[in-house]
């Protein structure tokens, strides 16, 4: 565990996130070299994708109940304006463009996924017109937050919905569900040939045409325009700053974009990119394409995956439209059809609007994060044996998804002792360490004749080592630990824009600060046990650091107890871990400390009193203390010395 750190020592948390993104891309498809190896992994990877999208398990499909709310037409096409249900009391809106006159028999169809133009389908009407004039049925639908649809794609982007992290809700998943339901609507049309349906779009629509094709194999061919990049360049080149929250899943399984979109294989996939697009990097998308194409080569179908590059900014060019048209003609229509370029908008907003500014009532689309999230439930036990079994299952579920990186982590803690001195009757040992190039710090203070118990106090972001020493220090042995992202390596939340995008970038590599802190605390505990013969180690933390201490104790049952100071009463308010609320909330996490000692300082009121009821049921109410810090720590040390 000893030894000096490498020459990256003192790197920032941002630098660590960037290197993590690069490593994810570098390790893409590791261990996969044959079609058998890919097929053996494919179902697992698709399930992981759906879980990262918040769609595992899938919501129940309700009846679409489509309602026609008007129509309009032009030369060679007619358009039906439709409202339909995404979920009960949650409405979507769409335009169905049909050729006029309609050809005989069933027709190929295009699901056009809109990007981020403010008035949704209105701004993309040229695409519906073009496809209808080329003999395709084309359905355009409004995204969440666009047109007349309520809801939010920018909750994290603007820093107003950090609770999405703990809910495990990403607008990428909300929009994917919206896309699946739009596909349901398209396939419900009797004139559509279900075996000849393609998906396309630009920007956010380019990303979601890919996401939809991964999730739903009813999509038979894809043409994505300016939709994505490698994880390495999306994060490392700060493209996250320019992207909506709907552009990536919460990447807890650490998959490069190429690994996600290779799940489309062997269906036809066209990737189109503008050379001068400010939101992406040519080296990133080219590498992504080459990695995806290797999977197509394993299927013996490299011609089904193609990259089309063209000059210009983040937009279509005439040659892009031609390439996409030829792609779908080949793979859906089965024949080459006359080329028709994109024209101008032909209809005013007052004509194209589906809801005329007011969706049907009731409409709960603004509640989609809550409606789509299945909250975990933990029953109160009737005995300690029952609770021990329940904790085993909770640990399994925690390590399966929200905290799975912690179990798989290959990151190492290196420590170097840089100070050993006496201050009165106390010995001070100072350690400078690093994990993946980011500095960590540990100061250990022991009496002249140390006891067998140690309190390990963990810094919260915004705290200093000296501040925590002054708050926690006492007659007992204690150590103060500065994990990554706290103390001197903490990002500055007063720089609100960059702080938000750092948080979002971390999510794109599957991390939150609380998750990193849990990982680092467990490493520090192992170091202290290896270097010294502490009979028992207790944990103390304030705020999110207190939450991290609770989870560290939940995962390491040799931890003697926890004092959690000023922690939130629910993960909706803080201590964010991706998707943690699908397993449990903070009162249940506190319960996982039982039957060990738990001290709660400045713990806000909450109505269920779940943790107190648990300790009462287990007959150990004396091991739960709610009150001041000094007494909470003193009781913990006292119980430790009695062997409780």
Model region roles, listed by residue range:
Residues 99:
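Aromatic-residue-lined binding/catalytic grooves and analogous aromatic/hydrophobic interfacial grooves
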Residues 199, 271, 457, 480, ...:
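Structural beta-sheet core signal
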Residues 142, 200, 225-226, 272, ...:
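Alpha/beta-hydrolase-fold catalytic nucleophile elbow
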Residues 118-126, 163-177, 199-210, 247-260, ...:
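Alpha-helix capping and helix-loop boundary segments enriched in small/acidic/polar residues
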Residues 134, 182-253, 524-592:
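Primarily recognizes the serine-hydrolase "nucleophile elbow" in alpha/beta-hydrolase
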Residues 103-188, 194, 228-240, 246, ...:
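Cap/lid segment of the alpha/beta-hydrolase catalytic domain
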Residues 42, 145-149, 154-185, 202, ...:
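Accessory cap/linker subdomain of secreted extracellular hydrolases
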Residues 1-91, 102-105, 259, 265, ...:
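Alpha/beta-hydrolase-fold serine-hydrolase catalytic core, especially in secreted/extracellular enzymes
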């Amino acid at each position: 565990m000893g030894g000096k750190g490498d020459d990256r020592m003192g790197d920032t948390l941002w630098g660590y996130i960037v290197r993590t993104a690069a490593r994810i891309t570098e390790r893409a498809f590791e261990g996969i070299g044959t079609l058998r190896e890919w097929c053996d992994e494919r179902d697992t990877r698709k399930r992981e994708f759906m879980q990262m999208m918040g769609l595992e398990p899938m919501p129940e499909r309700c009846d679409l109940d489509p309602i026609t709310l008007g129509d309009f037409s032009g030369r060679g096409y007619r358009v039906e304006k439709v409202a339909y249900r995404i979920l009960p009391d949650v409405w979507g809106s769409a335009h169905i463009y049909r050729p006029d006159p309609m050809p005989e028999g069933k027709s190929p169809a295009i699901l056009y996924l809109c990007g981020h133009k403010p008035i949704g389908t209105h701004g993309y009407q040229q695409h519906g017109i073009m496809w209808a004039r080329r003999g395709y049925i084309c359905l355009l639908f409004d995204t969440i937050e666009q047109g007349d649809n309520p809801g939010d794609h920018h909750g994290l982007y603007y820093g107003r919905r950090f609770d999405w992290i703990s809910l495990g809700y990403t607008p990428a998943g909300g929009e994917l569900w919206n896309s699946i339901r739009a596909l349901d609507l398209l396939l419900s049309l009797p004139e559509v040939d279900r075996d000849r349906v393609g998906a396309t779009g630009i920007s956010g629509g380019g990303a979601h045409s890919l996401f939809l094709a991964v999730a739903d194999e009813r999509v038979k061919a894809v043409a994505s325009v300016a939709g994505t990049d490698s994880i390495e360049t999306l994060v490392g080149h700060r493209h996250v700053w320019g992207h909506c929250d709907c552009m990536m899943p919460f990447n807890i399984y650490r998959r490069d974009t190429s690994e996600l979109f290779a799940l489309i294989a062997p269906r036809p996939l066209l990737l189109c990119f503008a050379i001068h697009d400010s939101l992406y990097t040519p080296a990133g998308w080219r590498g992504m394409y080459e990695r995806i194409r290797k999977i197509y080569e394993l299927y013996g179908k490299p011609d089904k995956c193609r990259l089309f590059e063209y000059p210009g900014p983040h937009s279509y060019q005439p040659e892009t439209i031609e390439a996409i048209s030829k792609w779908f003609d080949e793979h859906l229509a089965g024949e080459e059809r006359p080329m028709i370029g994109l024209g101008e908008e032909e209809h005013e907003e007052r004509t194209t609007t589906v809801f005329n500014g007011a969706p049907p009532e009731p409409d709960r689309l603004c509640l989609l994060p809550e409606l789509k999230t299945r909250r975990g439930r933990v029953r109160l036990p009737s005995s300690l044996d029952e609770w021990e079994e329940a904790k085993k299952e909770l640990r399994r579920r925690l390590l399966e998804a929200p905290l799975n990186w912690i179990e798989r982590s290959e990151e190492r803690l290196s420590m170097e002792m840089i100070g050993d001195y006496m201050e009165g009757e106390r010995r001070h040992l100072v350690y400078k360490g690093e994990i993946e190039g980011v500095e960590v710090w540990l100061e250990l203070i022991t009496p002249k004749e140390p006891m067998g118990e140690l309190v390990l106090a963990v810094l919260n972001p915004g705290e200093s080592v000296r501040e925590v020493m002054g708050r926690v220090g006492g007659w007992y042995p204690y150590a103060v630990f500065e994990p990554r992202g706290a103390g001197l390596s903490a990002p500055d939340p007063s720089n609100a824009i960059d702080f938000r995008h750092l948080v979002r970038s971390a999510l794109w590599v599957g991390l939150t600060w609380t998750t990193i802190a849990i990982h680092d605390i467990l490493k520090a505990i192992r170091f202290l046990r290896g270097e010294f013969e502490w009979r028992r180690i207790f944990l103390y933390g304030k705020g999110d650091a207190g939450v991290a201490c609770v989870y560290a104790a939940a995962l390491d049952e040799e931890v003697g107890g926890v004092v959690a100071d000023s922690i939130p009463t629910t993960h909706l308010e803080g201590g964010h871990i991706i998707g943690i609320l699908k397993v449990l909330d903070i009162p249940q996490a506190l319960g996982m400390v039982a039957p060990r000692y738990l001290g709660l300082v400045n713990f806000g009121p909450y109505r269920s009193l779940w943790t107190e009821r648990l300790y009462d049921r287990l007959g150990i109410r004396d091991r739960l203390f709610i009150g001041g810090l000094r007494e909470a720590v003193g009781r913990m040390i006292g119980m430790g010395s009695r062997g409780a």
